[in-house]
Amino acid sequence: PEKESAAFFFMFLAFNLFLASWNSKKEIPRYLLAFLAGLSTAAMANIWGAYVYIYLGIAVPSLIAFLIGKVGKKETSTYSIWLFTSFIVIVFISKKFTINEIIHSTYISSSIAVLFIFIMHFILFNTKIKAYLEKGYHSKIPNRATTLIISLIILFILSFVFFGQNFVANELS
């Protein structure tokens, strides 16, 4: 049977719902649309293996939006609801994938890394750490670049600790 046609429906639905959520001015519709985008992502994952393109197609533009200063609390909540909804449905409801398979997927782990960067930015620049980062030579580096550098270092260390020394090299090759 033609599964690609159904999968494309869910892929474009996920993209459209995510964008509608990202651009929504009101909280409840934003959360609902992000939730539905997560369900659409999970539906495609259950139909066709090309679901990873949804994760990549949302993670990369979201990271670019972050770097140009278009991501705040609203966008972070949208992104996290979409990501967690899709994970919960894929792992716990459909049982098609395990948590280990999700974490070891380069495409999906890149979506997790983008969320980590968003959260790290909030932690670094909305707490007392901000005062330290704005002193001395740190003050010359843009906030988002500082967040990106610190986040990538932390993610590299965490992947080294939890997955071993060859994880990053194997994923990049």
Predicted regions and their residues:
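Short acidic/glycine- and proline-prone juxtamembrane loop motifs at membrane-interface regions
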Residues: 1-5, 49-50
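Membrane-interface helix-loop junction between the first two transmembrane segments
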Residues: 4-7, 130-132
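Alpha-helical transmembrane segments of multi-pass membrane proteins
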Residues: 5-16, 34-37, 54-58, 83, ...
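Membrane-interface transmembrane helices that cradle and orient dolichyl/undecaprenyl
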Residues: 14-32, 41, 60-74
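Small-residue packing motifs within transmembrane alpha-helices
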Residues: 30-38, 53, 82, 109, ...
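Membrane-interface alpha helices of multi-pass inner-membrane proteins
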Residues: 33-49, 87-96
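Transmembrane-embedded, aromatic-rich helix segments that form part
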Residues: 51-64, 108-114
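Transmembrane helical bundles and short interhelical boundary loops of multi-pass, membrane-embedded
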Residues: 66, 72-173
